[in-house]
């Protein structure tokens, strides 16, 4: 019997999922993306060579692994083709291994224009989107007016729907946001050109996943962003437009929850966040700057500097509950090397002095103060360490304390960016 293993982020994204997916796909026949779009940025380092993927599953760098894009992913044809071309220039065979669900919604030029116009209009109150059209594309999907990958192959039907959509969206762009209209013919011509390239890659991904499952194959489900950016369970409204938590797997791939065997929660050894929104443990001092510098905390999609702070056990407990996490992968432990002391947030204090758990919306974070537990740091380097026993005693104590605070085992520890710089205590596919 094969196993279905999920890899998802437990914080605000950028936890290091790409490396771990790449590591574990050694055992997988297929890797599937089930939500998000090219707002994701998964960085992989193999033998010192860095590759950043935005839409294509991270398993593409493993020879022979099938890569699938499920119906829950919003697909920008231009971004996808750029990514395919870049990989093919490196000698990676993509088209014969990548398959895309015909039910995946399309991101087109008017979605990008709307996304950017809205952020511009919000000014200081902006949400901090990547400006890549993700939100507007999901809006069209939910409103049942969106175009999907499968529509590309029916020119007349596509053109009729596109005309209606542009009438609707251009009205907003021109009259409300005072931005230029999107041209119908140019958009149609571009889409039809992409259709020819995408047609050989279209496949009923849900049916393929169940065929693989029945054949006893191991399958990896690759999440994008992080649990606290979930549209329902995140720090609303400073969230993304998809379900980044485990519930999104079934809706975004068509594989029911009973078929999921193990859910691995990727967790950074400290906390980061990109863009606006609450961040109780954020550091504005030299320590925060040190974490950012050592951890190279700049977004792989936008290049934006990430906000850095201490490890927050409160938000991780919430993520473990919401996702039914089987085990944790702790990443970037080496970034903490050399710190004299390390703080862990164990709770929040409100104006009444009470320690409370993680709120369910952004406004409820206002006025909360983190309650810290201080632990000794370590001077030794953990970079590239391959066994638990080799880690400094203080680092092992830090890991153990996190397990105690969140009630879940740490099964994998990442000690560097390369796939080989990893300690595997319990293998998800075992």
Curated annotation (Swiss-Prot):
Keyword field contains Magnesium:
yes
Q: Can you tell me which residues bind Mg(2+)?
A: 14, 41
Q: Where does the record place the catalytic residues? A: 14 (proton acceptor), 42 (proton donor)
A single GO molecular-function term is: adenylosuccinate synthase activity
Instruction: Return the CDD domains for the record.
Output: AdSS
* Catalyzed reactions per annotation: IMP + L-aspartate + GTP = N(6)-(1,2-dicarboxyethyl)-AMP + GDP + phosphate + 2 H(+)
Cofactor, how bound (note): Binds 1 Mg(2+) ion per subunit.
Q: In which pathway does it act?
A: Purine metabolism; AMP biosynthesis via de novo pathway; AMP from IMP: step 1/2
Q: Could you tell me which Gene3D superfamilies the record lists for this protein?
A: Adenylosuccinate Synthetase, subunit A, domain 1, Adenylosuccinate Synthetase, subunit A, domain 2, Adenylosuccinate Synthetase, subunit A, domain 3
Tell me the residue numbers annotated for binding substrate: 300-306
Where does the record place it?
Cytoplasm
This protein's UniProt keywords: Cytoplasm, GTP-binding, Ligase, Magnesium, Metal-binding, Nucleotide-binding, Purine biosynthesis
What residues does IMP bind to? 14-17, 39-42, 130, 144, 225, 240, 304
Family per record? Belongs to the adenylosuccinate synthetase family.
The UniProt subunit note reads as follows: Homodimer.
Q: What is this protein called?
A: Adenylosuccinate synthetase
What lineage is this protein's organism placed in? Bacteria, Pseudomonadati, Pseudomonadota, Gammaproteobacteria, Pseudomonadales
């Amino acid at each position: 019997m094969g196993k279905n293993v999920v890899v998802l982020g437990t914080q605000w994204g950028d936890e290091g999922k790409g490396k771990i997916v790449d590591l574990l796909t050694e055992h997988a026949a297929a890797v599937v993306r089930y939500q998000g779009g090219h707002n994701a940025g998964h960085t992989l380092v193999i033998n010192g060579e860095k590759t950043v993927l935005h839409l294509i599953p991270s398993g593409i760098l493993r020879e022979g692994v099938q890569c699938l894009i499920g119906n829950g992913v919003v697909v920008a044809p231009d971004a996808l083709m750029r990514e395919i071309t870049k990989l093919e220039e490196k000698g990676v065979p993509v088209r014969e291994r990548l398959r895309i669900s015909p039910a995946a919604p399309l991101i087109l030029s008017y979605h990008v224009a709307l996304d950017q116009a809205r952020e511009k209009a919000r000014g200081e109150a902006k949400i901090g989107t990547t400006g890549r059209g993700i939100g507007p594309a999901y809006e069209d999907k939910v409103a049942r007016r969106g175009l999907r990958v499968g529509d590309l192959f029916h020119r007349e039907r596509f053109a009729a729907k596109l005309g209606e959509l542009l009438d609707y969206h251009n009205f907003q762009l021109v009259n409300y946001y005072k931005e230029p209209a999107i041209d119908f013919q140019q958009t149609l011509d571009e889409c039809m050109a992409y259709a020819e390239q995408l047609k050989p890659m279209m496949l009923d991904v849900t049916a393929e996943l169940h065929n693989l499952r029945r054949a006893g194959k191991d399958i990896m489900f690759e999440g994008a962003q992080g649990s606290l950016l979930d549209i329902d369970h995140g720090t609303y409204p400073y969230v993304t437009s998809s379900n980044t938590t485990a519930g999104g797997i079934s809706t975004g791939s068509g594989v029911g929850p009973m078929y999921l065997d193990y859910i691995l929660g990727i967790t950074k050894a400290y906390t980061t966040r990109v863009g606006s929104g609450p961040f109780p443990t954020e550091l504005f001092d030299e320590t925060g700057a040190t974490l950012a510098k050592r951890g190279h905390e700049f977004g792989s999609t936008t290049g934006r500097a990430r906000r850095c702070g201490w490890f927050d056990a409160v938000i991780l407990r919430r993520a473990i509950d919401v996702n039914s996490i089987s085990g944790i992968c702790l990443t970037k432990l080496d970034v903490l090397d050399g710190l004299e002391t390390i703080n862990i947030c164990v709770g929040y204090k409100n104006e009444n002095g009470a320690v409370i758990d993680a709120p369910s919306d952004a406004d409820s974070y206002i006025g909360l103060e983190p309650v810290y537990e201080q632990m000794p740091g370590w001077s030794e380097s953990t970079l590239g360490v391959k066994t638990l026993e080799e880690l400094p005693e203080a680092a092992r104590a830090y890991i153990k304390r996190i397990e105690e605070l969140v009630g879940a085992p740490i099964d994998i520890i990442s000690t560097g960016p390369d796939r080989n710089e990893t300690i595997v205590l319990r293998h998800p596919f075992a």
